Regions:
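Helicase P-loop NTPase motor core
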Residues: 1-71, 98
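Well-ordered alpha-helical segments embedded in enzymatic catalytic cores
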Residues: 27-30, 34, 89, 198, ...
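Short alpha-helix plus adjacent loop in nuclease-associated cores
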Residues: 75-98
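A residue-level signal for beta-strand positions that form part of recognition/binding surfaces
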Residues: 15-16, 87, 236-237
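Conserved helicase C-terminal RecA-like lobe
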Residues: 44, 59-64, 91-239
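Residue-level detector of family-conserved "landmark" positions at structurally sensitive sites
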Residues: 5, 48, 75-77, 120, ...
Length: 239
């Protein structure tokens, strides 16, 4: 935490500006633009601080600072958005759509939302929809679930990450799954929808899954580096 010392500055020329933005994406763009303006004026980055109410607040901003190569360091550890189980579910759907049909990946999302697919049908390390459909052909209702799952992944194959997240939430039925899960666990649904909204913000501007996955790797590496260097002398914008 920062030690705070507050003093009135009646003669200060600086003014407090209050701005509102339609979303975090636009807000972060403005923050980056303002910092770059200060950098052009040779303002020391150590004189710039970005304050948030909680340590989850700056998750999207960190990605924006990295994209523009703006040095920064964090006073507190920031939870990695992409480590959340909901994020991992969304990423697993994308991996399946790209053709990564490993049994372990398939198992994690095959019943999110509920499709009543039993793990007993998955006997190989790689899942084949043709084999799975053959095994459930005597159960028309289950056959339809599996066919729909296969078709959803086919449709997602060439989507942008943002389009895919929207599709998973609405067309695949992940929003309904989250609602049911929250009711069952007696947890506020907003906690989960907030994660999905943050994922959507993160995915903006990426054309392919590979590009977004590269960003996720770089973001995770930076968080890990910041965590290891915590307490050391640092230069950059303070977050």
């Amino acid at each position: 935490r920062f030690e705070k010392k507050m003093e009135a500055q009646p003669n200060s020329e600086a003014k407090v500006e209050i701005r509102t933005f339609k979303d975090h994406y636009e807000e972060n763009k403005h923050i980056v633009y303002t910092i770059r303006e200060e950098m052009a004026k040779k303002t020391p980055l150590s004189q710039i601080a970005i304050l948030y109410r909680t340590n989850q607040g700056p998750r999207q901003l960190i990605g924006a600072l990295m994209a523009y190569n703006i040095p920064f360091y964090m006073q507190d550890a920031v939870p990695n958005l992409f480590d959340h189980w909901i994020s991992k579910n969304i990423i697993d759907y994308m991996k399946l759509a790209r053709g990564d049909m490993r049994r372990s990946t398939f198992l994690r999302v095959m019943n999110r939302p509920k499709r009543y697919i039993s793990r007993e049908y998955l006997t190989d390390s790689e899942v084949s929809f043709d084999d799975l459909l053959e095994k459930v052909k005597d159960k028309p209702w289950l056959y339809e679930y599996v066919e729909d799952f296969k078709e959803d992944l086919r449709i997602m194959k060439n989507m942008t990450p943002l389009m895919a997240i929207n599709y998973i939430r609405k067309s695949v039925g992940y929003n309904a799954y989250i609602s049911e899960y929250a009711r069952f666990r007696k947890i506020q649904e907003e906690e989960f929808t907030h994660v999905l909204e943050e994922l959507q913000e993160s995915a903006k501007g990426y054309d392919t899954y590979e590009e977004w996955f590269d960003h996720i790797r770089e973001y995770t590496e930076e968080l890990n580096r910041q965590s290891k260097e915590n307490g050391e002398s640092k230069e950059g914008v303070v977050v």
